[in-house]
Amino acid sequence: MGKEEEIARIARRLDKMVTRKNAEGAMDLLRELKNMPITLHLLQSTRVGMSVNALRKQSSDEELIALAKSLIKSWKKLLDVSDGKSRNQGRGTPLPTSSSKDASRTTDLSCKKPDPPRTPSTPRITTFPQVPITCDAVRNKCREMLTLALQTDHDHVAVGVNCEHLSSQIEECIFLDVGNTDMKYKNRVRSRISNLKDAKNPGLRRNVLCGAITPQQIAVMTSEEMASDELKEIRKAMTKEAIREHQMARTGGTQTDLFTCNKCRKKNCTYTQVQTRSSDEPMTTYVVCNECGNRWKFC
């Protein structure tokens, strides 16, 4: 079994432990990883960093948490080194001055260096277009805050993404869509930051880091689109409940003077009883005031 397959196997076992909430044997797997020479290529292709990070968040074992943090910290250095090389290459790229053969060869080599694919699963690292540099203080500050949001919980280490570059992409897309740095622009950036940092919605941040959601998409998504699956389900249930209440109030019912409207204080009401939960629980009573149209319910 090759090194990549072995690391991928460990990652799968860690994922199962997280799913089952049973970390028995996790320390042995983490020690195996500690003794393995991990490269940035292996980190990106196996996504083992995300598995270790998920285990760290779930565990209450201090020794396990410490070892997981140590691994993530050591892997982060690989990403920092890679980012440093990329920045140095960007600074060292010669400006076009002459048509000499040596300069042409140097340019050709610098263009060819990024070509070898790091992994098929992470093309975004090499295919993102270059972002224009801005001297606008507001835009630069927004890029910094977006970078910090993307770095929440260190998921970027596991994926192997340059957060500074990605945040610049997102900010550039927002700026191009809005056209200036007015309040609309600031509110747009602020909502991206809030949702990317949301501890209850880590899926959004991971999808952005992995490229499943592109910078162009996250730049224009609505709050509803960025919401977590759990919040979407709650909103869906509330919408269904509101529709049902409205329909119940309009489909007949029994007229009574037993209820007093808390809005107009009249007793001219119509009520409907519906079994909305299990059969052994009380029915839900929907009441509508025939005088002012006020609606309420109780169990």
Curated annotation (Swiss-Prot):
User: Hey, what tissues is this thing expressed in?
Assistant: Testis and ovary specific. Specific to testicular germ cells.
Instruction: From the Swiss-Prot or TrEMBL record, give the protein name.
Output: Transcription elongation factor A protein 2
- Source species of the chain: Mus musculus
- GO molecular function annotation: DNA binding; zinc ion binding
Gene assigned in the entry: Tcea2
**Stretches the record annotates as Disordered:** 82-127
Q: Which PANTHER family match?
A: TRANSCRIPTION ELONGATION FACTOR A PROTEIN 2, TRANSCRIPTION FACTOR S-II ZINC FINGER DOMAIN-CONTAINING PROTEIN
Q: Does the keyword DNA damage apply?
A: no
Question: What SMART domains does its record include?
Answer: TFS2M, TFS2N, ZnF_C2C2
One annotated Gene Ontology cellular component of this protein = ciliary basal body
Cite the record's Basic and acidic residues compositional bias ranges: 102-116
